[in-house]
Amino acid sequence: SGSQDLEPSSGLVTDAIADSESEDDEDLDVPIPSRFDRRVSVCAETYNPDEEEEDTDPRVIHPKTDQQRCRLQEACKDILLFKNLDQEQLSQVLDAMFERTVKVDEHVIDQRDDGDNFYVIERGTYDILVTKDNQTRSVGQYDNHGSFGELALMY
């Protein structure tokens, strides 16, 4: 398993709250099922969202111009994580976002680093690099749109 190094060719990336760890499909070892294997149980406490205490943390708001807000909203409109948000929820997400300009060859996230932001690409080309066995290879590219670092939103 490995994280991705994201190295822009050029561009602008927008942060909102993350880290990017993606599993390399070649690393997955799927055991062959045996009829003699024991069944594994999973237990968890019941969760009732109505019983959850209200969030008392202060809301994070980064000031931005109307133009910046429109650009952020446009960059986020096709991101699956945000598709089912109502206008108020999306507004809160946009409030928490801030812009970050990225220079050519700057690493946005490095493999094995703790990520602390979720990134939304407004423009630019970003290479996704993975290092395995001391060899770095390109496994993908973002071109003028996309997002990465979803795991940071969970923590």
Swiss-Prot record:
GO terms for cellular component: cAMP-dependent protein kinase complex; cytoplasm; cytosol; germinal vesicle; plasma membrane. Phosphorylated by the activated catalytic chain. This is cAMP-dependent protein kinase type II-alpha regulatory subunit. Keywords: cAMP, cAMP-binding, Cell membrane, Cytoplasm, Membrane, Nucleotide-binding, Phosphoprotein, Repeat. The inactive form of the enzyme is composed of two regulatory chains and two catalytic chains. Activation by cAMP produces two active catalytic monomers and a regulatory dimer that binds four cAMP molecules. Interacts with AKAP4 and CBFA2T3. Interacts with the phosphorylated form of PJA2. Interacts with MYRIP; this interaction may link PKA to components of the exocytosis machinery, thus facilitating exocytosis, including insulin release. Forms a complex composed of PRKAR2A, GSK3B and GSKIP through GSKIP interaction; facilitates PKA-induced phosphorylation and regulates GSK3B activity. InterPro entries: cAMP-dep_PK_reg_su-like, cNMP-bd_dom, cNMP-bd_dom_sf, RmlC-like_jellyroll. It comes from Sus scrofa. Four types of regulatory chains are found: I-alpha, I-beta, II-alpha, and II-beta. Their expression varies among tissues and is in some cases constitutive and in others inducible. Its main location: cytoplasm.
